[in-house]
Design a protein with these regions (language model features):
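Structural signature of the thiamine diphosphate
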Residues: 218-286, 408-413, 433-481, 601-616
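Non-catalytic terminal/interface segments that mediate subunit docking, oligomerization
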Residues: 66, 270, 278-392, 397-407, ...
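Cofactor-binding active-site loop characterized by glycine-rich and histidine/acidic residues
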Residues: 42-163, 316, 333-334, 338-339, ...
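Active-site nucleophile and cofactor-binding loops and adjacent substrate-binding regions
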Residues: 41-49, 68-73, 101-120, 143-147, ...
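N-terminal amphipathic, basic-rich helices that act as targeting or association modules
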Residues: 1-82, 238-260, 268, 272-278
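Long, well-ordered, tryptophan-enriched scaffold segments
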Residues: 175-320
Length: 616
């Protein structure tokens, strides 16, 4: 039994001495490496916050205090220390432990997290609720430095700094250049300010001046003089200008110092920011050397520190990367834009070859889309490479700054559809619905990597106006070619309609139906806006029945538009719409999620059978 195995309560954690705490931190890192190696997940960021997480759990009672994680992928250590250690073997699996904070898992997860830069907003809301309800608990927002590239963080800090709420923001700085007060004198000043005696003297001085005539005015005058000379000699941090009391930087791997600083800021009665310096991947050499690779990783060999290469197949993101790189050589007006996802979207090759035409704007999706509009207005051809779940953050800019002017901006929408282990915060299941609501928007849905390359070239070089090309995470399925016509399989009993890579399940369903004596016609739509209603109508007139399968929520889905359009054309008959419904889909392997939603081949075949038996 390891020391970590004995930590089953906060009391047990708080009882450890310094040597035991060092041993515990080493044990947590070993536990993380071994478990994430089996399940995949976010490793480097969690290795970097081991000491910080341990200190937070010792200083704060997270069953009562509110500890909010920005983004949330650095919450593994928190989960280990709050009763979920034994569930780590199920991390990111269907029905298992989520890879992000989840209130349904534990009272110590006060809020869901998954997207960046929102933690201070949520924390301020909780702090204000605490004040209004006359309750007593601490509110802490833990924000990675990357989240500080998102404008929402500054909106919240601007508001929080003007408030009088007791609020603690911890900035986990593991690589961004965020400059605090610099120089030996400034560091000495910070050291003085973090000594308890400093505050005892300050409190005593205020008490004495309050008792003498004109003492309050004297205190205010001396305080202003002190602040004036401090600013003259040492300057101020950006955070202080926003109204936060700033502490730091602090070594994020010095547990004793961290606890001291956390107890200090815990006693402040106004907004405070603690700046902590950590090393991403700390304690595991492969992750220290390649923190980006180990940020989010599949299962790997913990001894070699690498993913198994056998059976490695090119992904849709790889195809996008190769295609946009080739297009960059062909057309000098092409610019590529990403919001802090250069490697994830596959733009790293384009950035290496055409650095002056590649823009990583940080976690600023709205800015990325508006800037793309500006580039397009001046004759460039911007390609915004973005995950589906993050594009929804820029919906207003897409409407106002691109579509309203009919500008030719190409959106390469990666991770469209169900993404697997990252779960409900990351599934790309809303873009079908909101993109199709945008006037003038064209939406293409390749079903294979070959189609992705073809459609991307067409979108960039031939089409006009705003265009979205949406494609999934992962590799090709059984369908790998390029469909010349929508009809992939002729039939006479029922029409099966789908788009994108779900065609693989639909084709498999058609084979299952054939074994049951049902002849299914299969249509694959290359575009979901505009829709080829004519082809669907012609097929349904022949078969008399229709099933539409799609990896999207039901409100505003393709199936509903098809149904309305067919009815308007006088085409009737039994119809079944198979989609994700009006709900959030949990984490798990995509095949398991297909079964959950009724989108796997067997479920689709059963649904089509019911339609043919007039039981729909």
């Amino acid at each position: 039994m390891t020391l970590l195995d004995t930590i089953n309560s906060r009391e047990a954690l708080c009882a450890l001495n310094d040597a035991q705490l060092r041993q515990l931190c080493d044990g947590i890192r070993q536990f993380l490496v071994l478990n994430v190696a089996r399940t995949g997940g976010h490793l480097a960021s969690n290795l970097g916050v081991v000491e910080l997480s341990v200190a937070l759990e010792r200083v704060f009672d997270t069953s009562r205090d509110r500890l909010l994680f920005d983004v949330g992928h650095q919450s593994y250590v928190h989960k280990i220390l709050t009763g979920r250690r034994d569930e780590f073997r199920t991390l990111r699996m269907f029905g298992g432990l989520a890879g992000f904070p989840k209130p349904s898992e534990s009272v110590t997860d006060p809020f869901v997290a998954g997207h960046a830069s929102s933690s201070v907003s949520t924390a301020l809301g909780m702090a204000r609720a605490r004040t209004l309800q006359h309750e007593d608990y601490h509110v802490v927002a833990l924000m990675g430095d990357g989240a500080m590239t998102g404008g929402l963080a500054y909106e919240a800090m601007n508001d929080a700094g003007e408030s009088s709420e007791q609020l603690i923001v911890i900035l986990n700085d593991n690589g961004m250049s965020i400059t605090p007060n610099v120089g030996g004198i400034a560091q000495h000043l910070a050291l003085i300010r973090t000594r308890p005696g400093y505050y005892r003297i300050k409190k005593a001085y205020r008490a004495v001046t309050a008792k003498v005539p004109g003492g309050k005015c004297l205190y205010r005058l001396t305080h202003r003089l002190k602040e004036h000379w401090k600013r003259m000699l040492f300057g101020t941090t950006f955070f202080e200008e926003m109204g936060f009391e700033y502490y730091g930087p602090v070594d994020g791997h010095d547990l004793k110092r961290l606890e001291y600083m956390l107890r200090l800021v815990k006693d402040r009665r106004h907004p405070v920011l603690l700046h902590v310096i950590t090393q991403k991947g700390k304690g595991y050499a492969p992750a220290e050397e390649n923190p980006d690779v180990f940020h989010g990783i599949g299962h790997f060999d913990p001894e070699k520190g690498m993913e198994p290469r056998c059976g490695h197949l090119p992904t849709f993101s790889d195809t996008f990367s190769e295609t946009i790189d080739a297009l960059g050589a062909q057309e000098p007006r092409i610019c590529a834009i990403t919001a802090a996802m250069l490697r994830g979207t596959g733009l790293d090759a384009f950035a290496a070859h055409y650095p002056e035409r590649c823009f990583d704007v940080g976690i600023a999706e709205g800015h990325a889309v508006s800037m793309a509009g500006g580039l397009a207005k001046q004759g460039m051809i911007p390609v915004v490479a973005i995950y589906s779940t993050f594009l929804q953050r820029a919906y207003d800019m897409l409407l106002q700054d691109v579509a309203m002017l009919g500008l030719h901006v190409v959106f390469a929408v990666d991770r469209a559809g169900l993404v697997g282990g990252d779960g409900e915060t990351h599934h790309g299941v809303f873009d079908v619905n909101y993109l199709r609501s945008v006037p003038g928007m064209q939406v293409l849905c390749p079903a294979s990597q070959a189609e992705l390359g073809q459609m991307l070239r067409r979108a960039v070089l031939e089409m006009t106006g705003p265009v979205a090309v949406r494609y999934p995470r992962g590799c090709d399925g059984a369908f790998t070619g390029i469909a010349e016509q929508p009809c992939l399989r002729e039939g006479k009993d029922i029409t099966l309609v789908t788009y994108g890579t779900l065609i693989n399940e639909v084709l498999a369903a058609a084979k299952l139906l054939e074994a049951r004596g049902i002849s299914a016609e299969v249509l694959k739509l290359p575009s979901i806006k505009p829709l080829d209603v004519r082809t669907v109508a012609a097929s349904m007139r022949k078969t008399g029945r229709l099933l539409v399968a799609e990896e999207a929520v039901c409100i505003g889905c393709v199936g509903k538009e098809l149904l309305a359009s067919l009815r308007a054309r006088g085409v009737g008959g039994p119809v079944r719409l198979c989609n994700l419904g009006d709900r959030f889909i949990p984490h798990g392997a995509v095949p398991e999620l297909y079964r959950l939603a009724g989108l796997d081949a067997k479920s689709l075949a059963d649904a089509a059978w019911e339609v043919c038996q007039n039981e729909a």
